[in-house]
């Protein structure tokens, strides 16, 4: 049951990243763009938390964890760069 709850949380915050990026690209203003990108970044950070929890609970293997977390960290780096650059362009 715990695995289901954690997996559901990862699905929720993981898909929210893409949804917020999509909304940001259609933002009505630079402030709207920044706000949605910040939300996407927060969701990526939350995804990292849930992945770590799944791994520490032995619900996913070390190999699975390393593969997925590497992708998630790359997403966080990209979003962080976008947010910083959008702050500088105001």
Please give the residue ranges for each predicted region.
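Short, C-terminally biased terminal segments at protein or domain edges
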Residues: 1-19, 23, 27-90
């Amino acid at each position: 049951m715990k695995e289901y709850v954690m997996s559901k949380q990862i699905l929720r915050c993981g898909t929210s990243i893409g949804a917020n990026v999509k909304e940001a690209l259609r933002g009505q203003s630079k402030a709207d763009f920044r706000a949605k990108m910040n939300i996407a970044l927060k969701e990526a950070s939350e995804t990292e938390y849930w992945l770590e929890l799944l791994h520490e609970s032995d619900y996913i293997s070390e190999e699975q964890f390393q593969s997925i977390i590497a992708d998630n960290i790359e997403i966080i780096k990209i979003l962080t760069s976008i947010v910083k650059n959008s702050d500088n362009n105001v």
